[in-house]
């Protein structure tokens, strides 16, 4: 479905698109990004963004660009949830942005993440059992890999100190279990290679005779 068609469909049927762009600043190709909100001329997109992925996780500050019809209700909902965001943190972040420090930080961060992404992508492509079912994106913080039983492998890998997330965590029904989400941003390059090797080793173990796994 094209973006243009999606926006037209939203306008024709009077529904709202929620665009969560928390990883939008982490683009590695240097090209300007086009958001749905930027293309929207019919006030149909509610845009969300956050600094927790690109700055520091504990800085729970973000912002909304909302269609006018939702403004009062969202302000009331936020007030009922926490009354107000911390003013000092907001002032600090505003100053950080105004002085151009965020742009400098982001450039450095993107360079680091890009090298880690290349490292993990190459390790996955060279592994015995893993593959990338989706086209690589020039940004973000993780990969999805496909396997027969993500939950079983996840349980075994936890014992080896390999931290990842099975697809069931992101499923509304908990039934999806054939993908693992691998993040590359929180560890050095050598640990990325070690982690992929460990995943391959565990899959080898599960594929041995009398084990439960079978690759079709």
Where are these regions (language model features)?
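PLP-dependent class I/II
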Residues: 1-216
